[in-house]
From Swiss-Prot:
Forms a heterodimeric complex with ABAP1. Interacts with SPL. Residues 144-162 form the R domain. The keyword Transcription applies. It is found in: Nucleus. One of its GO terms (biological process) is leaf development. GO terms for cellular component: nucleus. This is Transcription factor TCP24. Residues 50-108 form the TCP domain. It holds the Pfam family TCP. Expressed in cotyledons, particularly in the vascular region, in leaves, roots, stems, buds, flowers and siliques.
Amino acid sequence: MEVDEDIELQKHQEQQSRKLQRFSEDNTGLMRNWNNPSSRIIRVSRASGGKDRHSKVLTSKGLRDRRIRLSVATAIQFYDLQDRLGFDQPSKAVEWLINAASDSITDLPLLNTNFDHLDQNQNQTKSACSSGTSESSLLSLSRTEIRGKARERARERTAKDRDKDLQNAHSSFTQLLTGGFDQQPSNRNWTGGSDCFNPVQLQIPNSSSQEPMNHPFSFVPDYNFGISSSSSAINGGYSSRGTLQSNSQSLFLNNNNNITQRSSISSSSSSSSPMDSQSISFFMATPPPLDHHNHQLPETFDGRLYLYYGEGNRSSDDKAKERR
């Protein structure tokens, strides 16, 4: 847009300089042009002449605007005269007034037709136009170069941003696809309420190879109801099925047998262990002999109860006695 305005300004300045050049030939030419009203019309653009886009006329006092501002009273009288004459255009009413006052106009003194000051103004205008044209051309060229460089930088920046976005999207998609395979299994701390149902792994390092070994120990899910060993006598036997039974021999013995076997395997594979003897004895200890007829917990047992359905620890002799 600015380049177009500069070009338009140059065109108008050239037209103005060409029209002003008509009056600088000689005095006779100036008088001839002075008598020709059409040759005294000069068009001025808004860029060079300010607010006006219309043409101006050349007078003895320089360029003047064709539009005339009238006072309120004069404008009322003029438009009343125009309406009485029946003219559509104000210029026709002005022409009628000039013709009607021709006798009075001839009595007026003649105008000074010496246009030396106009030649000086013309030369100044030409120099100003030439300098302004050169400056505007240089400015337009520099602006064009700056805009071209700015467009190139913008294109390069846009291309770099696009490539970066594509690369980030590709890398994120690749990480999404391969993220599950790169993750290593982490050691979990079994502290929840449901951890008792899962096997627990204990790492026992070997003194010779310094490699950790995972030895799973399965623990029976215990529920501590805070019942002492003497409360088992209140139950009065095993008359009902699906009740809480204390000191279940079958499952507890099987579980301890499994623990003993696994502990013996681990102890045979490693001669020394950093664990203390008390923790080892907890896993490898065997329960004391149980009495099926005396339904009381031993002193070494901590009073924990286990829930079983059926009659897992009852012998066939007890069942036969109850049936009789």
